[in-house]
């Protein structure tokens, strides 16, 4: 059976933390900033963790990620 391959699109979007959780960036950060409040833009800058509901599915795509 062939080797499992890491999903390259997901590998660019997620980083694994030291404890094994997955870190991701926020959506809504590419353009149209004039319509967003300062508070909203400030919160969107910070990375956040992947939710438990999505974690299992994303982990399968990133099985070989270091």
UniProtKB/Swiss-Prot annotation:
Residues 1-26 have a biased composition (Basic residues). One of its GO terms (cellular component) is cytosolic large ribosomal subunit. InterPro entries: Ribosomal_bL35, Ribosomal_bL35-like, Ribosomal_bL35_CS, Ribosomal_bL35_sf. One of its GO terms (biological process) is translation. Keywords: Ribonucleoprotein, Ribosomal protein. Transmembrane segments: none annotated. It comes from the Bacteria. Pfam families: Ribosomal_L35p. Residues 1-29 are annotated as: Disordered. GO terms for molecular function: structural constituent of ribosome. The keyword Nucleus does not apply. The keyword Transferase does not apply. Coiled coil: none annotated. Belongs to the bacterial ribosomal protein bL35 family. HAMAP family: Ribosomal_bL35 (MF_00514). PANTHER family: 54S RIBOSOMAL PROTEIN BL35M, LARGE RIBOSOMAL SUBUNIT PROTEIN BL35M. This is Large ribosomal subunit protein bL35.
């Amino acid at each position: 059976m062939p080797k499992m391959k890491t999903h390259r699109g997901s590998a660019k979007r997620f980083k694994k933390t030291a404890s094994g959780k997955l870190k991701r960036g926020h959506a809504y950060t590419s353009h149209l900033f004039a319509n967003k409040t300062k508070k909203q833009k400030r919160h969107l800058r910070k990375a956040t963790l992947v939710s438990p509901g999505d974690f299992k599915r994303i982990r399968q795509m990133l099985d070989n990620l270091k």
